[in-house]
């Protein structure tokens, strides 16, 4: 089996990261302006991050959100005051695409409307609804074109 060809790959294989820097398999150092889809913006191998992840993995790596998870409750309680929206409800997702798709679904449930406005040239992820909201025919399958999306 081989990997699905989603993107044209750059001829560079990072094997190590520290702070804002990456090293490839040939030892070439790069200043990393990417940050992994904005999920590692504190830098690579940050000691606090590594310690907290290691601590959690030594207890349990993952479990369903269908059971009580005090860490999720603690996160919600901390995010409220930090964001200025303490009365909001937190809905945790695995990816930006999943967050975008669920935001559209929640808006539709709330308003009863089906039509969605999306920006020309925007990219929202690779789940079905996120692709439908992305104005890029190269990634849209016929099934993605059934959504009620108007591009502005």
Where are the predicted features?
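N-terminal glycine-rich, Lys/His-bearing helix-loop that initiates the first secondary-structure elements
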Residues: 1-88
């Amino acid at each position: 089996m081989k990997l699905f060809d989603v993107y044209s790959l750059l001829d560079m294989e990072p094997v190590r990261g520290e702070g804002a820097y990456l090293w490839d398999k040939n030892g070439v150092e790069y200043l990393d302006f990417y940050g992994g889809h904005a999920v590692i913006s504190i830098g690579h191998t940050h000691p606090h991050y590594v310690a907290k992840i290691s601590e959690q993995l030594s207890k349990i790596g993952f479990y369903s959100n269908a059971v009580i998870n005090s860490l999720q409750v603690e996160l919600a309680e901390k995010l409220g005051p930090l964001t200025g929206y303490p009365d909001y409800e937190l809905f945790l997702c695995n990816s930006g695409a999943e967050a975008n798709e669920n935001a559209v679904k929640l808006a539709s449930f709330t308003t009863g409307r089906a039509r969605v406005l999306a920006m020309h040239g925007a990219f929202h992820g690779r789940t079905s609804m996120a692709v439908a909201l992305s104005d890029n025919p190269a990634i849209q399958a016929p099934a993605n074109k059934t959504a009620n999306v108007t591009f502005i």
